[in-house]
Amino acid sequence: MIGYVLNGEHEEIPYGELMALLEIFNYNGSVERLKRYVITEDSPAKDIVKRSGYIDEGHRIIFRYNLEEKSVDLVDKIVNDFINSFKDFVANIDYPDIDESKSYAVRVLKLHKDEFTKSIDSLRIEKEIGGIIKLKTNAKVNLTKPDILVRVVILENTFFISNVLEMRDREYFQKNRPHLRKYFHPGCMLPKLARAMVNLARVKEGDIVLDPFCGTGGFLIEAGLIGAKLIGCDIDWRMASGTLINLEEYNLLDKVIKVKRLDAKYVKEFLNELNIEKVDAIVTDPPYGISTAKKGEIEKILETLPEVIKDNGYFVFAYPKKIELDMELEGLYKVYIHKGLIRHIHVYKKI
């Protein structure tokens, strides 16, 4: 079994992104969600976590322990029973991934916070579970840079012991924030959310992705890194030019079909010039801080864009309110930005 740790910044986007990625990688097995921990059968955890914006870790689940009782007064007994159950389980198996040639460390991750889980002694669990693994495998303990990180995941009514297969690249999202790019304009979406929106659009390598309000190119960067072919436009020539500057910085110009200055209401004609009838996905974030009349124009453009999307393709966009389109709404997520702005992330599928 495989376990996924969902990021806690948003209640639903991480799960929606995971379900999209499971679909992208053609997974058809069972899915069990325990709030921020999701269990599947043998799904490609490394590929999914590497590509994700909001999936923190992918695990190979070794042991599952369901609590029969739960009380702060009984916490020592419950932890003892858990440790002894794991010891009995390990006695009858070859512990996966770890042997005397590998180093390991055990770390507790509490994904549920209440008085009971707060009272659990993480250090004790790490020490005792680590000792059991040591006796079984004769592997070396390395607390700073282990070959294998063993996670003890503590949920509301369930404990898991898992080997970490992959961790999300937090450094990428820190080092690639919009203000650190060669061309920057205020109001850009953070790359973590941009990556998640590209994933929600089920973008695959070789797909044609369009951003008709491309701004500084955030969505096109994330789609290009996946291997998609890129089309972008913006009514502001500085933005279109800045997008190309940023795509060049990421060595993605070879993925570009065309980026140009263009009013998005002429996208259909733009695609015709490129001999492209329809695209696989549109991912975009139209401008918000504009007059009521301009907002009306943008909403009309949003209503016409499904015409250039292939059947079964996706239209994923952010807007300050819910927009009804003649497509299948598969997801709607609210992202609080500040007092005056809540982004509504729409995930539409063309049926």
UniProtKB/Swiss-Prot annotation:
Highest taxon above the source species: Archaea
Pfam families xrefs: THUMP, UPF0020
GO biological process assignments: tRNA methylation
Domain THUMP: 57-165
Record's keyword terms, sorted: Cytoplasm, Methyltransferase, RNA-binding, S-adenosyl-L-methionine, Transferase, tRNA processing, tRNA-binding
Reactions this protein catalyses: guanosine(10) in tRNA + 2 S-adenosyl-L-methionine = N(2)-dimethylguanosine(10) in tRNA + 2 S-adenosyl-L-homocysteine + 2 H(+)
UniProt enzyme class: transferase
Cell compartment(s), UniProt: Cytoplasm
Primary localization class, coarse: cytoplasm
CDD domains: AdoMet_MTases, THUMP_AdoMetMT
Family that this chain belongs to: Belongs to the methyltransferase superfamily. Trm-G10 family.
Job description of the protein: Catalyzes the adenosylmethionine-dependent methylation of the exocyclic amino group (N(2)) of guanosine at position 10 of various tRNAs. Acts via a two-step process that leads to the formation of either N(2)-monomethyl (m(2)G) or N(2)-dimethylguanosine (m(2)(2)G).
Protein name: tRNA (guanine(10)-N2)-dimethyltransferase
